[in-house]
Structure formats: C-alpha cells, structure tokens
Amino acid sequence: MGTIATNPEGITNPPIDELLEKTTSKYALVIFAAKRARQVNAYYSQLGEGLLEYVGPLVETTPQEKPLSIAMREINGGLLTAEPTDQP
C-alpha cells in the first residue's frame, strides 16, 4: 500500500495566491510556469546526451519532483522573472 505524503506539494505548495502576486494574471502564470517546466524537462533529457542548452533547476529538488512543481517553486522564490512580449 502507498503512503500519504505529509507535506503535499504541487499546486498546494507554493500557495496559488503567492504565485499570482508574481505575474500579471492567472493566464500569464500558467504560460510562465509551463515554459519553465518544459525547460527543466529538456535539461534533464539533455543530461545524458552531454548537451546543456537549458538551465537546470534553480532550487533544491528531489528525484520524484515534477518539472511543473520545480518551476512553481522557482517562480515563488523570485528566481525567475517574466518579461512581457509583443507577440499576440
């Protein structure tokens, strides 16, 4: 049988209200976190190939932690900034 995590992670940690303070809207937060999660995922994929095109996680991680959770913790920690673009 599985065990229940004592410290839930993901969308509950960091709290969504804290994350929304870091961006202009909830839609911007979704795009921001998704782009960073893709970069983290690509970084892990490239480790075995010796290609390091992307920057790895900026926070301490655990082996089972998902890239989206890592991205949200980086955003909440103020380690990343979102730059508005002129693209639609």
Swiss-Prot record:
One GO cellular component, as annotated: DNA-directed RNA polymerase complex
Signal peptide range equals none
What's any GO biological process attached to this entry? DNA-templated transcription
Q: Which UniProt keywords apply?
A: DNA-directed RNA polymerase, Nucleotidyltransferase, Transcription, Transferase
Q: Which InterPro entries match?
A: DNA-dir_RNA_pol_omega, Pol_omega/Rpo6/RPB6, RPB6/omega-like_sf
Molecular function via GO: DNA binding; DNA-directed RNA polymerase activity
The chemistry this enzyme catalyses reads: RNA(n) + a ribonucleoside 5'-triphosphate = RNA(n+1) + diphosphate
Name of the top EC class for this enzyme: transferase
Q: Which Pfam families match?
A: RNA_pol_Rpb6 (PF01192)
Q: What is its quaternary makeup? A: The RNAP catalytic core consists of 2 alpha, 1 beta, 1 beta' and 1 omega subunit. When a sigma factor is associated with the core the holoenzyme is formed, which can initiate transcription.
Q: What does this protein do?
A: Promotes RNA polymerase assembly. Latches the N- and C-terminal regions of the beta' subunit thereby facilitating its interaction with the beta and alpha subunits.
Q: Which family does it belong to?
A: Belongs to the RNA polymerase subunit omega family.
Protein name from the UniProt record:
DNA-directed RNA polymerase subunit omega
Give the species. Salinispora arenicola (strain CNS-205)
